[in-house]
Amino acid sequence: MMRKALLALCVATAFAVAQAQNVAYPNFPYCQCIKSPSPYSLEPVVKSNRTGQYCFTLRVTKPSPSATGYCATKADIKKIEINVNQVCDVFGNVVNATLNGVPTKVGPAFDTPPDGPNTSRILRFTQLNLGLDSDGAMLCITLGQNDKGKGCTTLEDLCAPPAGAPKGTCSLALFDSKPDCCPISRVSPPAPPPPPPPPPPEPVAVPITPPCKTCVYATITALPPLLFPFQLTPSICQSVADKIAGDLEMIVTSYSIGYSGATITCSGNVIKVCASFSLPPGAPYTGLQADISNALTFWLSLLAPSTGCPAYFANHQVTVTVGGDGDPNSVTCLEGTATTTCKPGNPDFPKCECETKPAATRFAALPTLTQEPGRPSNRTNSTLYCFTLQVVAPLNPNGLCGNTTTLLKAELWGNDIPTQRRKILALAFKAAGASSPLRYLSPSWGSAGEQTLKVSGLNWDASQADGAKICMELSNDTNLKTFCNTGQDTCWINLFSPDKQCCPLFAASLTP
């Protein structure tokens, strides 16, 4: 009997652990969506006209002429979801809602997010039909109990507050019709009536402002479809974190604030930089918050420059958030968010008609370039930049391109103006598993104006291509930004099938 009980306990425990490990989105709003920029927010303090009724006021900031992107300029509001406690999800009609004094078209509903933890709950208000002309719209909810006395009647009972926030703090996500966008607002219940003034206190020493621990989170999130998911490397983490830590110290110490130094953590695809500091007694955080907000755009550009994302971030979202120690949504004395979505490039290359879609064939190139010093025998100092090939599952294994079993040749996008033609000293390649060193070839260009470098005569099968190298040896008096026509440290290569009808195109970038 004891053995059966132990066995049942082990099975239940394993199931619970498996469930916990399979949660796709552990934090509100428990789905993948774009949180900023957005013209929509809610007033930070809820209005309460009577017991059990709470009203949320929408604020719409008209998009600036320079704003871009659907979420920043065109999104509507179809539904609003509140992060609530599981215990409030009871049988019966315990929540009623009005929009601008009229009952909502669809009644409020509790739900369990399909991709969130089993214990998570949201309260949904849908078919709201709000937009850029809805500034001041008011959504009011009335909380009650069912006939068994069950239900949450205050915001303190209803809302699941963010980490570190007091009870009654509510997180609300404003979803558009697609839904792609979900700006998040945090609101608090109205303050209670002030107590009668106390008698004059005895003179006491001015207390020291408690320390503020602020963290900067840089998060890279994959967006399918995806051939090569990004994996954060120690070099990228350290390079980005060092710059953020240096900026934090410079900003904080400019206010004559005690600064304890930064701690750096890299976990998964999240870079986390935290620091603690204290303002002098009575000093506001206003100026410090403004400087932190201004720094967000620069910190975002460390990973995703405004000139274009590196190739290894294609189909990824990069977000920089300022919050408390815990997770990016934790509340602290400072806050802010900046985000961008990196899309694959679309160069005017190759100059022939063929299928360029990545994974059209089984032959692919990784999105990272390697570099090393060029041959010492050259008359000029040089650097070797190499693509690394990999064999992948083709998109359509039974199609013309998917059936390709041989890599005939490769072509690289290069700047063929006369001054740049002379900057490439050689092309080189090496099959996977080959015992011989790189084989060097004189550069072979296409017709003038085609900007095409050719690496012919490969004829590799899958075993030779999986891990093979194709390289350019460039003089050090040029750089990839100029030679590869991209304005950044990114180059393009396509890989041809024997019939030249299939030529999947790939970008690769240097890493810090």
UniProtKB/Swiss-Prot annotation:
The answer on whether this UniProt entry bears the keyword Signal reads: yes
Q: Which GO CC terms are listed, alphabetically?
A: extracellular region
Keyword annotations for this protein, in alphabetical order, are: Extracellular matrix, Glycoprotein, Secreted, Signal
What subcellular locations does the record give?
A: Secreted, Extracellular space, Extracellular matrix
Please give the InterPro entries that the UniProt record associates with this protein.
Answer: Pherophorin
Residues bearing attached sugar chains per UniProt:
49, 96, 118, 378, 381, 403, 476
Where does the protein principally reside?
secreted
N-terminal signal peptide: 1-18
**Record function comment:** May be involved in conversion of asexual males and females to the sexual pathway.
Q: What protein name is recorded for this chain?
A: Perphorin-1
